[in-house]
């Protein structure tokens, strides 16, 4: 309820007593609204009195009688306000609409949809949709009934319902509404369809995007430049760059001129695939069409070239056409330098960014912190964190996760758990990544019991573990030979519909080989194949290493041959494992032969390789001396 001052109360009374359409009942109601006690008896509330109160902005009266309003009275009042939807919206704001029945709520939404601004009705729709009390189909059907009561031809209400679902990232519900509109003969606007296509693209539901786009075409809903831009982006995501560029010709056929966004989308698509020359050709074409490249054009190219260590080429090109790096450019440069281990240059770009008047973002700091941890510069990372805190910047979930993971990777469980407690205190909820890092550090310290307890706690809170978390915990148990628990986790994964991958099976195979159960490990590879999971070079190296440690070089070489037949190239680990097996069996000549093969394949032997060969030869010499 709003509070009113004495002058405000007087104004309300005067406006009713002196205004047009004076009603004694309304005047008495206004007086009672200001002076009533729990025992006061209100006069009957009629539609006439309620409408007078609304039209004269006597909202204190509306608020006073709100809990006495029946759905029927509210509906009648709303229908009387169809031509003044702004008053209908104010009326709804002064009563508890959600105390009323679903039918009345939908009627209110339908009336308010006649406002020129879509924001009020969109907000109401979001509240109804997120309440989850009714299905989208029920909501749609009730809105159709409300729409029919208003006797209006406009179908904007249903377009807004679709857009509302898209804003809530409820893409399946948005698509359902689209087809319900089709059933009713309501044709969605192109902009509404673009909302669905955009969301499908963002969610990487590429196949669904093409099906929906085809249905748009069949329904003769015209595409505009935004539609084409979205579909060009979809093609770029698929890696179909030639087809994406071909859409420029299709746009011309439909008389739609590309915009700078069209060209920038293509440049980004080519750049993400490392097709820099193709991206440059598109830039040349856009220039010929009168478009000047901007930072959105060059930043994707800069990003790829940064990874290649060729950022200076792009910066020089940008400078030549008068483009100045923006905050996105600097963050790209900082990330590139950090990933390449050049932290000095990364911080130099940060300083240059500040000199140019740009404020470093969370992304900037998170990139630098991650880079410092990757280079084992823990103290420098802690200094940077203090700097961030001194600036009054509150750490976000990404920063906490980077820090926790950094400490976990370096085995500092104490600091990692302290940060976990701190983020909880700050009201930031830990994620799957947070708990995976903590489980990792516990397993690394052979504290698998504590890791299991943390895992059970996480699951108990309702968080569904992901594949990485399961693999991390499983690897911890495999490392200490606790294979019963490891296989029980595999069963839990099946129960939770978490599909294992090659990493899962490699962990189990490594654990079995560590226990000397080589045949079981081999059988596990068979199971892996039956489940449609392709073994990788790690799978084969694990078996080769296991057999070699046992001295079973026959089976080790058989696995190596199978590995070669499937197109996997032996690695340094493969050869070193085989050399250890030959050394164990005192097969010096074969070891020398394998060393020569290794060199011919372009694999440089390391100390371990030479030690195994020397040991094998020494054993062979000793064997010859004994004979």
Swiss-Prot record:
| PPR repeat start and end residues | 154-188, 189-223, 224-258, 259-293, 294-324, 326-360, 361-395, 396-430, 431-465, 466-500, 501-535, 536-570, 571-605
The answer to keyword Transferase applying to this record is: no
User: Which keywords does this Swiss-Prot/TrEMBL entry list?
Assistant: Mitochondrion, Repeat, Transit peptide
Q: Where is the transit peptide?
A: 1-29
Q: Does the keyword Mitochondrion apply?
A: yes
Got a GO cellular component term for this one? mitochondrion
Xref: Gene3D superfamilies: Tetratricopeptide repeat domain (1.25.40.10)
The subcellular localization recorded is: Mitochondrion
- InterPro entries per the record? Pentatricopeptide_rpt (IPR002885), PPR-containing_protein (IPR050667), TPR-like_helical_dom_sf (IPR011990)
Q: Which PANTHER family match?
A: MEMBRANE-ASSOCIATED SALT-INDUCIBLE PROTEIN-LIKE (PTHR47939), OS03G0201400 PROTEIN (PTHR47939:SF13)
> In which family does this protein belong, per the annotation?
Belongs to the PPR family. P subfamily.
Record's protein name: Pentatricopeptide repeat-containing protein At2g15630, mitochondrial
Question: What is the protein's species of origin?
Answer: Arabidopsis thaliana
Lineage, broadest ranks: Eukaryota, Viridiplantae, Streptophyta, Embryophyta, Tracheophyta
């Amino acid at each position: 309820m709003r509070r009113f001052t004495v002058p405000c109360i007087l104004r309300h009374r005067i406006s009713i007593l002196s205004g047009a359409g004076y009603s004694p009942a309304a005047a008495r109601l206004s007086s009672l609204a200001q002076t009533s006690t729990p025992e006061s008896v209100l006069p009957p509330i009629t539609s006439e009195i309620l409408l007078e109160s609304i039209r004269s902005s006597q909202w204190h009266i509306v608020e006073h009688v709100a809990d006495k309003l029946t759905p029927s009275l509210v509906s009648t009042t709303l229908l009387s306000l169809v031509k003044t939807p702004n008053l209908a919206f104010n009326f709804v704001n002064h009563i508890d609409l959600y105390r009323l029945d679903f039918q009345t709520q939908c009627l209110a939404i339908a009336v308010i949809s006649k406002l020129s601004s879509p924001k009020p009705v969109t907000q109401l729709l979001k509240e109804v949709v997120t309440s989850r009390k009714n299905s989208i189909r029920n909501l749609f059907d009730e809105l159709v009934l409300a729409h029919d009561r208003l006797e209006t031809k406009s179908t904007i209400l249903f377009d807004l319902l679709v857009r509302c679902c898209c804003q809530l990232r409820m893409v399946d519900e948005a698509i359902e509404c689209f087809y319900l509109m089709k059933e009713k003969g309501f044709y969605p606007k192109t902009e509404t369809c673009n909302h669905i296509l955009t969301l499908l693209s963002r969610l990487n539901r590429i196949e669904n995007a093409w099906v929906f786009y085809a249905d748009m075409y069949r329904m003769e809903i015209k595409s505009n430049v935004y539609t084409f831009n979205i579909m060009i982006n979809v093609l770029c995501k698929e890696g179909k760059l030639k087809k994406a560029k071909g859409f420029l010709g299709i746009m011309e056929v439909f008389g739609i001129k590309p915009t700078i966004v069209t060209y920038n989308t293509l440049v980004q698509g080519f750049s993400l695939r490392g097709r820099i020359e193709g991206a440059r050709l598109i830039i040349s074409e856009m220039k010929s069409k009168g478009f000047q490249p901007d930072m959105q054009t060059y930043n994707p190219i800069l990003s790829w070239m940064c990874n290649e260590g060729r950022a200076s080429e792009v910066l020089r090109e940008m400078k030549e056409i008068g483009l100045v790096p923006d905050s996105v450019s600097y963050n790209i440069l900082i990330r590139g330098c950090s990933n390449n281990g050049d932290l000095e240059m990364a911080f130099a770009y940060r300083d240059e960014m500040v000199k140019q008047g740009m404020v470093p973002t969370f992304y900037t700091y998170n990139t630098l912190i991650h880079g410092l941890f990757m280079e084992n510069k823990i103290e420098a990372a802690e200094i940077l964190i203090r700097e961030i805190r001194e600036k009054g910047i509150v750490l976000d979930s990404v920063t906490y996760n980077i820090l926790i993971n950094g400490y976990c990777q370096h085995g500092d469980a104490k600091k990692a758990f302290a940060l976990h407690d701190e983020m909880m205190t700050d009201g930031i909820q830990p994620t799957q990544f947070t708990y995976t890092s903590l489980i990792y550090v516990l397993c690394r310290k052979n504290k698998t019991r504590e890791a299991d307890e943390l895992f059970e706690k996480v699951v108990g809170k309702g968080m569904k573990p992901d594949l990485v978390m399961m693999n991390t915990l499983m690897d911890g148990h495999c490392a200490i030979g606790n294979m019963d628990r490891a296989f029980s986790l595999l069963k839990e994964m099946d129960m939770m519909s978490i599909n294992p991958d090659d990493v899962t099976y490699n962990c189990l195979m490594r654990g079995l080989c560590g226990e000397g159960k080589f045949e079981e490990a081999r059988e596990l590879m068979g199971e892996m194949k039956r489940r449609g999971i392709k073994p990788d070079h790690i799978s084969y190296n694990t078996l080769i290493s296991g057999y070699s440690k046992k001295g079973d070089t026959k089976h080790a070489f058989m696995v190596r041959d199978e590995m070669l037949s499937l197109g996997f190239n032996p690695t340094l680990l493969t050869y070193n494992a085989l050399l250890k097996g030959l050394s164990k069996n005192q097969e010096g000549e074969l070891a020398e032969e394998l060393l020569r093969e290794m060199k011919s394949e372009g694999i440089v032997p390391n100390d371990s390789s030479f030690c195994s060969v020397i040991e094998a030869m020494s054993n062979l010499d000793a064997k010859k001396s004994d004979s």
